């Protein structure tokens, strides 16, 4: 074991996918305090020489962090907070986006449209902890929704989503904080504010992980028959082609003014564990 960074600041590794494909570099973000999201750079360090490179530097008062690496190429994805934050719009669970950096160029991963009627393929809030699939084609993330947060913060439930390579998604901006993105984004989990005790319903989906290239496992918070929170493991199988990603089910992919975005047709989570019986 050896120390490879020495600067008097916090160097934070994401909990997955921090090695470059050649196994020579580790990527990290830098924060004055480990508990705050106030870093301005995404960096990497060579594990042999200790050389540090800045991959991206934020501007206009924005902050960045939680970086992961593409499995096959020199490409990085990370959280980007809002530029020019103010009292009405600053970094929060529902005010952040994914950004991809490659070859010195950056682009928004997810689009955001918070003005009805909402744009299919765009999100309406903030994405978080972006992770490439093993083949590098898709990106998973967790999500919180601005529209539902404005309606009632209790309805802004954490969910799991996927960015698929079927963009770009161009938003006709009607709000200064809206933006377009490179990928088609949808939610793949389904939550409810009031799960039925003892059922498979959940009010929170999080900590997802890839199972091959076409499925995600995640933790969902259920209620036991006694009404106690019990985190359980779920799995969801994903569409195989562009048509599948863009096909709406019983509810709109982009959501409504009173409902969250819905998964594509045929995409449904399945419960794997039943630990509340213990």
Model region roles, listed by residue range:
Residues 1-278:
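Sequence signature of WD/YWTD-type beta-propeller architectures
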């Amino acid at each position: 074991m050896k120390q490879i960074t020495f600067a008097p600041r916090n160097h934070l590794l994401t909990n997955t996918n921090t090695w470059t494909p050649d196994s020579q570099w580790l990527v990290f973000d830098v924060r004055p305090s480990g508990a705050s999201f106030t870093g301005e750079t995404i960096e990497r360090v060579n594990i042999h020489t200790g050389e540090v490179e800045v991959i991206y530097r934020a501007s206009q008062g924005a902050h960045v962090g939680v970086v992961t690496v593409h499995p096959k190429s020199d490409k990085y994805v990370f959280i980007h907070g809002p530029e020019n934050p103010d009292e009405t719009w600053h970094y929060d669970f529902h005010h952040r986006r994914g950004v991809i950096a490659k070859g010195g160029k950056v682009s928004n991963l997810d689009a955001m449209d918070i003005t009805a009627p909402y744009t299919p393929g765009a999100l309406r809030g903030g994405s978080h902890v972006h992770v490439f699939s093993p083949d590098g084609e898709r990106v998973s993330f967790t999500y919180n929704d601005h529209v539902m947060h404005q309606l009632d913060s209790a309805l802004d439930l954490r969910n799991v989503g996927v960015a698929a390579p079927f963009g770009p998604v161009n938003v006709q901006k009607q709000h200064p904080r809206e933006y377009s993105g490179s990928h088609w984004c949808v939610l793949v989990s389904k939550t409810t504010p009031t799960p039925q005790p003892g059922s498979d319903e959940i009010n929170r989906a999080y900590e997802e992980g890839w199972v091959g290239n076409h499925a995600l496992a995640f933790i969902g918070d259920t209620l036991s028959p006694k009404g106690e929170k019990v985190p359980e493991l779920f799995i969801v199988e994903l569409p195989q082609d562009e048509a599948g990603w863009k096909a709406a089910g019983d509810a709109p992919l982009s959501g409504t003014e009173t409902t969250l975005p819905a998964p594509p047709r045929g995409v449904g989570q399945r419960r794997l564990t039943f630990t509340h019986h213990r």
